[in-house]
Amino acid sequence: MSSTQQFLVIGGLVLLSLLALNFYRASDIQYNMKYENEATITATSIAQSTFEEMSTKAFDEVTTDWKTDSQDSLTLTASFGPDSAETTRTLFDDIDDYHGYYFVDSTMNLGKFNVSIIINYVVPSNPNTISSTRTFTKKATIFINNSYLKNQLQYIYAYSY
């Protein structure tokens, strides 16, 4: 085999190697995107079901048994979180019991989803603004992490009384 033929064979092998590398790189990117998309859909499902669960609870501890017209009677932000008798999520009776709540959902096929919840009073006309005083609008923010997600996902829902 002449040196020209050897160069052509080597050049062909190099091109074939580059083609194979690009194929595997593209396949890897596709798989990563597939798993990230599936994890995003699963996280959204977890957040949605948690928001729906929260919507079945009373707006505030004082509204579990009666109505109120006074914002001053609502729970102080510093007192958000479960009461001492509310040791599990099934015992929560109002929205702010979920404040600071953390749980791991591993029922799906992509491993563990770490979920944490923060509750704040917000300005009713602008739910993106946290209120320093008690209002008749609370914002629930759910943060979800998973090993297939590049970034922590954040879901927000506002509840009004």
Regions found by a protein language model. Give the residues of each.
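Low-complexity, Gly/Pro-rich coil/beta segments used as flexible assembly/activation regions
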Residues: I41-Y161
